[in-house]
Amino acid sequence: LGKGKGGGIVPEHSTGVKFVRGGNQFKPDNKPLKVGKNIVVIEPEGFCPYCNKFREDVSNNYAGNIPLSYRKASNLEGLSIKTPTWATPTILFLENGSEVFGYQGYLTPKEFYKALGFFKLGDSEAYRVAFNEGTDARFCKEYEIFKNTPDGIFIDKLSGKPLFDTRDRFVSRSGWLSFTRPVEGSVYEKPDNSYGMRRTEIRSVSSDIHLGHVFDDGPKGMPRYCINATVLEFVPRGGV
């Protein structure tokens, strides 16, 4: 962190959290971390190759709606932390200022999103779909909400990255959200031979969660991406 031109306030890395000067050091304001769910990444004062790797692989690409902030181990005043913070990075998952759980050391994107999934989704249908290759019930509540949204984008429920566009949505009468294509580069395909069937699974590139399957019976010879609504969130166009 560096001193601002007026000697006053220095913003923390893209989090919007402001630092106020106290004595000879800048101390972060931890009040926002005491409200709701937050992710805190502990980094050292000096160079940390695995901290840099975590930023490059995970946090710089994270766009989810649970705030992610950075702190030094000496800047955790007012927070209830259980995990030792001598190893860096240490990733903490907080709720109302208290640690729910934490991890010492580097997490791969897959490990981070598995932890985030448990933190955000808990023991829910969305978690089962995302991480256990589950399937929404036909015409589930989320489907009924999302089938007639205004113009916009469906995003990954964990990473916040765009996945599908309402312009590519169509009514398949299948009971699941259906699209003719994903947002370019947002998903990848994987063979799925479970339950004695040959299908093509669709997974999110950013978080690696299970999204659904793609079939060849879409309108006018196009594909039909059959997608579980519980692992999506919706953002009106212009809000991504």
Give a label for each model feature.
Residues 1-29:
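Low-complexity, glycine/serine/proline-rich disordered segments
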Residues 82-92, 198-200:
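Structural micro-motif
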